[in-house]
Design a protein with these regions (language model features):
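Signature aromatic-anchored transmembrane alpha helix within multi-pass, membrane-resident enzymes
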Residues: 191-204, 382-416
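Perimembrane helix-loop-helix junctions
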Residues: 166-204
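Short hydrophobic alpha-helices at membrane interfaces in multi-pass membrane enzymes
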Residues: 94-99, 135-154, 194-195, 392-397
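Membrane-interface alpha helices of multi-pass inner-membrane proteins
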Residues: 145-163, 172, 200-209
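Transmembrane-helix motifs of polytopic, lipid-linked glycan transferases
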Residues: 75-92, 321-329
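Extracytoplasmic loop-helix module adjacent to an early transmembrane segment
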Residues: 6-45, 56-61
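Membrane-embedded, lumen/periplasm-facing catalytic core of multi-pass transferases
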Residues: 210-251, 407-502
Length: 576
């Protein structure tokens, strides 16, 4: 039944909803995996363990037209939800189990399926595999189930290792409570405890071992090692809070970073390894971090930020509240456990607000982990009478019906895309999808894979392979990737004459090779070359680039518009 429920749900999503990547990171990694940068599938997936890349690689050789990167993420979400569903069907009576499964798949499953994002996929696999793995150990379930769920948990850490720091807090809470229960039981538990510790220990060792293998795989290649180090420094700058150049001016001046240089870093325009060297990027990141430690964030300001974020209105938060109320109603003697789960979840939320790393995918991870933890402690309701059981089953039915009605709303796609043409396509995407780090309920119904597309700019690039096109991050990174259907793999070498000016692929070895092919190893300086063009529709970032060239290389540098296609402006820069 677990397979049947989740199959029906996934098929309905595939038939009626517009599946897309929530953030551009997934698109870039799928492009790398397909061989768009270079001439063959590449398992170096930046944020994802290289072992996952090796797992996908054979499929790209067998059927290179299909985006196996997306298919495998959808499959992992499906198996994770199915495992949780299986556990609940084993623990609860059928009506109650179906109710919590429907609540799970409508609140969390639709989110993970429609807006695919690797962090959400990872937390689903780690928590789904983790709680069923723990349950199977304590309940002495078949070894096959333990191996299956342990593997699921492991694959989740391959997708995004860092989710274990969120999942770990909730899984630790489950373990503490389970061991406490075990010690309170008057049974011979020594062998059972040893078996649990050994099984969990083996899984933990394998997880850490795979992470170490990933680190080794990058470190053994000097180019990939440099890429990882540069990416770390880049992330420490662009992901940090921005208090303005004035806050760091004194220290930045000491390392010869002007206000425009600083803005270039912040606006993802650090495409010059000579000036934006690894050493200077690290020093800049350290200056920002040092200043951050001197800034005090009051409790009132922190709570106000949480309130204005509107977390309490997220469907995933409401689902956790509904599950908590149900749990307290059914099992009044276990309200302490549910309170503990909420405390752990709130601590995580406060922590991420404190470090100012507030994005929806992290909030999703926290609420999913909370939901799974609350779900784990649900037990079959044994009413005092048949009438009592009937009343609760009636309530479950109401919840199931409400969830299904709300789910059906997602199956009614927004048709505003039909009014969009090639010229207004860019504005349409920017309006609804640009702020991918925030929750927007419209995005689940908005359609990006149908209707008119801005293929004019892509055709221009494709038809001029002798030219190198550098795409400004602010202009293209958050919008242009919607022009490709996520189910289709990009052809090998598709990006061999177009690169993001600076972004998560900066100093990626295959990208550096493309730059080398056009003798543009320093992209900023190379903008004045005859065969290098800039796609930039933001006057502010364009002016920053021109000013950078004037400050560092060409005092009389200037930019002229070359073409404008579908709202994308192509510029040619000159020395004078």
């Amino acid at each position: 039944m677990a397979v049947a429920i989740n199959s029906i749900f996934l098929i309905s999503i595939l038939l009626f909803c517009d599946i897309k990547y929530e953030v551009s990171d997934d698109f870039v990694m799928s492009a790398i995996m397909s061989g768009a940068y270079g001439d063959k599938p590449n398992p170096h997936l930046i944020f994802i363990n290289i072992l996952w890349g090796y797992l996908l690689q054979p499929f790209y050789y067998i059927l290179p037209q299909i985006s196996w990167y997306l298919i495998f993420q959808l499959a992992l979400c499906f198996f994770s939800l199915t495992m949780i569903s299986y556990m609940m069907l084993q623990k609860l009576d059928r009506v109650m189990a179906i109710m919590v499964i429907v609540l799970l798949v409508t609140a969390f499953g639709s989110d993970a399926y429609i807006l695919v994002q690797f962090t959400k996929t990872a937390i689903l696999a780690v928590m789904g595999g983790g709680i069923v793995f723990v349950w199977s150990l304590f309940e002495k379930r078949p070894l096959k189930l333990q191996l299956l769920t342990g593997t699921l948990c492991l694959l989740g850490t391959w997708i995004r290792f860092d989710v274990i720091y969120i999942a770990g807090g909730f899984l630790l809470l489950i373990l503490v409570i389970e061991f406490f229960r075990l010690f309170r039981s008057n049974r011979n538990i020594k062998k059972h405890i040893i078996r649990i510790i050994c099984s969990g220990g083996i899984l933990l060792v394998v997880v850490v071992g795979c992470k170490l293998w990933d680190i080794h795989a990058y470190n053994k290649d000097s180019d990939y090692k440099f890429f990882r180090e540069y990416s770390q420094a880049r992330g420490d700058i662009v992901d940090a809070s921005d208090y303005g150049y004035e806050a760091y001016e004194e220290q930045l001046r000491k390392i010869d970073v002007s206000e425009n240089d600083y803005l270039m870093m912040r606006k993802w325009n650090f495409a010059d390894n000579q000036f934006f060297s690894l050493e200077r990027m690290k020093k800049t990141a350290q200056i920002i971090a040092d200043y951050k430690r001197t800034v005090e964030l009051s409790k009132e300001a922190l709570l106000e930020q949480i309130q204005t974020r509107g977390i309490q209105g997220y469907p995933i938060c409401i689902a956790c509240i509904v599950l908590t109320v149900l749990g307290i109603t059914i099992q009044k003697n276990k309200y302490g456990i549910r309170l503990s789960v909420w405390i752990v979840g709130f601590i995580y939320i406060i922590y991420f607000f404190y470090i100012e790393r507030v994005v929806y995918r992290i909030e999703y991870a926290i609420f999913l982990a909370s939901f799974c933890c609350i779900l784990y402690f649900f037990e079959e309701y044994k009413g005092k009478s048949k009438e009592d059981v009937y009343v609760f089953n009636y309530r479950y039915g109401i919840i199931i019906l409400l969830c299904l009605i709300l789910q059906c709303v997602l199956y009614l796609p927004d048709r505003s895309y039909q009014e969009i043409d090639e010229q207004s396509r860019k504005e349409y995407i920017e309006t609804f999808f640009y702020e991918s780090w925030n929750y927007n309920p419209c995005n689940y119904r908005k359609v990006a894979n149908k209707g008119a597309k801005s293929i004019g700019i892509l055709n221009e690039i494709e038809q001029h392979k002798d030219k190198l096109y550098l795409l400004d991050f602010q202009t293209t990174m958050q919008v242009l990737y919607y022009e490709w259907n996520p189910f289709n793999a990009l052809p090998k070498g598709a990006f061999n004459n177009m690169l993001y000016f600076a972004g998560i692929t900066t100093n990626f070895p295959e990208c550096n090779q493309i730059l080398s092919n056009y003798k543009a190893e320093q992209p900023l300086k190379a903008l004045v070359q005859e065969n290098v063009y800039l796609v930039d529709s933001d006057e502010r970032t364009l002016d920053q680039k021109v000013k950078y060239l004037q400050e560092h290389y060409y005092p009389k540098a200037r930019a002229e518009i070359y073409k404008e296609i579908d709202g994308y402006q192509i510029w040619k820069l000159y020395k004078k």
